[in-house]
Amino acid sequence: MASLMSNAAVVTASTAAQANMVAPFSGLKSTSAFPVSRKSNVDITSLATNGGRVNCMQVWPPRNLKKFETLSYLPTLSEESLLKEINYLLIKGWVPCLEFEVGPAHVYRENNKSPGYYDGRYWTMWKLPMFGCTDASQVAAEVVECKNAYPDAHVRIIGFDNKRQVQCISFIAYKPE
């Protein structure tokens, strides 16, 4: 069966009674009906104070202190801290994966001005992702194995969420001297 569609516009007649059904806009209402909480005393002594000491924040030094991942501003993770981070991603149900980079572990462009594959954003995967891993010491043992195979490489641990198919966590597990 075929159906027939029409492009003709349908015009309805409007009566004066219909026009009066909606009240005209009379402007915004006064704000006096709403409660207002204003602080009448603007004395500077009532503001938060640090006891008279003024400490300015320092700027991250851009030379010889490269930032790599989320926790790169912190000192190198101890073995205990590393195990806690690995345990966190395992508790979340993420799949641990190790990657390493021999050479500069930051984004650089020496062959071209535009971004590409060989500009330091992509690291080499160490073995396969550790699907089914439930123990943080297994991941730490793989970090040691990668560190022994490539002592001059940076090693990072990534946590993948295989349900959402995204990388959820990434941190440096080993930095060469």
UniProtKB/Swiss-Prot annotation:
Return the CDD domains for the record. RuBisCO_small
Where is it found, in Gene Ontology cellular component terms?
chloroplast
Which InterPro entries does the UniProt entry name for this protein?
A: RuBisCO_ssu, RuBisCO_ssu_dom, RuBisCO_ssu_N, RuBisCO_ssu_sf
GO MF terms here are:
ribulose-bisphosphate carboxylase activity
Q: What is its main location?
A: plastid
What subcellular compartments does it reside in?
Answer: Plastid, Chloroplast
Q: Which keywords, in A-to-Z order, does the entry hold?
A: Calvin cycle, Carbon dioxide fixation, Chloroplast, Photorespiration, Photosynthesis, Plastid, Transit peptide
Q: Which domain of life is it from?
A: Eukaryota
Q: What does this protein do?
A: RuBisCO catalyzes two reactions: the carboxylation of D-ribulose 1,5-bisphosphate, the primary event in carbon dioxide fixation, as well as the oxidative fragmentation of the pentose substrate. Both reactions occur simultaneously and in competition at the same active site. Although the small subunit is not catalytic it is essential for maximal activity.
Assembly, per entry: Heterohexadecamer of 8 large and 8 small subunits.
Family under the similarity heading? Belongs to the RuBisCO small chain family.
Entry protein name: Ribulose bisphosphate carboxylase small subunit, chloroplastic
Which organism was this protein described from?
Silene latifolia subsp. alba (White campion)
Lineage, highest ranks first: Eukaryota, Viridiplantae, Streptophyta, Embryophyta, Tracheophyta
State the encoding gene: RBCS
